[in-house]
């Protein structure tokens, strides 16, 4: 467990706990449990009363989180599924409403450091998998080896906002005629050939786009958010951490389209402190949005 502590620092923990407005007896959902960084603190705030419901699609990560949470309290239940199943979960638990829900849309540092599934361009020897769950069939390699040039170009533009998406797609199609994409290094060779050096690594947007599509992240997020007005108790809170403009746009649109039922607690988006960014690089692009269910 010490190893887990080292590789996982929950982003904006103090702010998240503050805006969830926790107290003993409340029913809280952590829709993106991960290694349980935020949930550990949520359990402490509940003080053995109420219920924490944790959701994660990665069984390996879920089991690690379970061991961590057991050391704090036992008033929690975990589900190995996608968070767009939240209404089904509440039905199974015979619950009508929840008091708070957290979405931390960043992928766990476990996936970069320990999963060996090719989430990071810093791991050239890993396979191009990028699946959070083995129940998903489509891998990053499948996309690179089978999508046509237009599909690849659209993917990199829509989900990565990569300005050289067309050029990159063309080069990928050319390259796979000679050699299939299997490992991270195979993709990096093409990226480095097409995309010039940038402030952030030139593969960042490409890997983001592939990860989003492999795991159907945008559609799952939209489906989950649409359920919130029906499951959040009056004055209940929704707290969302986003890390890139695509998912942040989805969250902004949700608050806008459901303003009759949920109002934004803060007029402006909340950003991590300079100190936190210095201590935890994963926090640098984080944006925190908070909504409250109208009575």
Swiss-Prot record:
It holds the Pfam family Methyltransf_5. The keyword Methyltransferase applies. One of its GO terms (cellular component) is cytoplasm. SUPFAM superfamilies: Putative methyltransferase TM0872, insert domain (SSF81799), S-adenosyl-L-methionine-dependent methyltransferases (SSF53335). Keywords: Cytoplasm, Methyltransferase, rRNA processing, S-adenosyl-L-methionine, Transferase. Its EC number is 2.1.1.199. The keyword Ion transport does not apply. GO terms for molecular function: rRNA (cytosine-N4-)-methyltransferase activity. It is found in: Cytoplasm. It is an enzyme of class 2 (transferase). S-adenosyl-L-methionine binds at residues 36-38, 56, 90, 104, 111. It comes from the Bacteria. GO terms for biological process: rRNA base methylation. InterPro entries: RsmH (IPR002903), SAM-dep_MeTrfase_MraW_recog (IPR023397), SAM-dependent_MTases_sf (IPR029063). It catalyses: cytidine(1402) in 16S rRNA + S-adenosyl-L-methionine = N(4)-methylcytidine(1402) in 16S rRNA + S-adenosyl-L-homocysteine + H(+). Belongs to the methyltransferase superfamily. RsmH family. HAMAP family: 16SrRNA_methyltr_H (MF_01007). Specifically methylates the N4 position of cytidine in position 1402 (C1402) of 16S rRNA. This is Ribosomal RNA small subunit methyltransferase H. It comes from Dictyoglomus turgidum (strain DSM 6724 / Z-1310). The gene is rsmH.
């Amino acid at each position: 467990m010490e190893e887990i502590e080292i590789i996982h620092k929950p982003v904006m923990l103090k702010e998240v706990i503050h805006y969830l407005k926790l107290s003993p007896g409340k029913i809280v959902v952590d829709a993106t449990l991960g290694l349980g960084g935020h949930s550990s603190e949520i359990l402490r705030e509940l003080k053995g009363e109420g219920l924490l419901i944790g959701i994660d699609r990665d069984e390996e990560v879920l089991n690690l989180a379970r061991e961590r949470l057991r050391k704090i309290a036992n008033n929690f239940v975990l589900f190995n599924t996608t968070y767009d199943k939240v209404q089904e979960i509440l039905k199974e638990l015979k619950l009508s409403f929840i008091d708070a829900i957290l979405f931390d849309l960043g992928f766990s540092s476990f996936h970069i450091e320990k999963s060996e599934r090719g989430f990071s361009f810093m791991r050239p020897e890993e396979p191009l998998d990028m699946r959070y769950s083995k129940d998903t069939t489509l891998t990053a390699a499948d996309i690179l080896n089978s999508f046509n040039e237009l599909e690849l170009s659209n993917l990199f533009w829509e989900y990565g906002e990569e300005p050289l998406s067309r050029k990159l797609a063309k080069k990928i199609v050319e390259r796979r005629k000679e050699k299939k994409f299997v490992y991270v290094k195979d993709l990096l060779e093409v990226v480095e050939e097409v995309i010039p050096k940038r402030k952030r690594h030139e593969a960042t947007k490409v890997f983001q786009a592939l990860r989003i599509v492999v795991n159907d992240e945008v559609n799952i997020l939209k489906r989950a958010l649409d359920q919130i007005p029906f499951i959040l108790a009056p004055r209940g809170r929704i707290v969302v951490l986003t890390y890139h403009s695509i998912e942040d746009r989805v969250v902004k649109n949700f608050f806008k389209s459901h303003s009759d039922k949920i109002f934004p607690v803060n007029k402006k988006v909340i950003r991590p402190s300079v100190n936190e960014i210095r201590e935890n690089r994963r926090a640098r692009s984080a944006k925190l949005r908070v909504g409250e269910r109208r009575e």
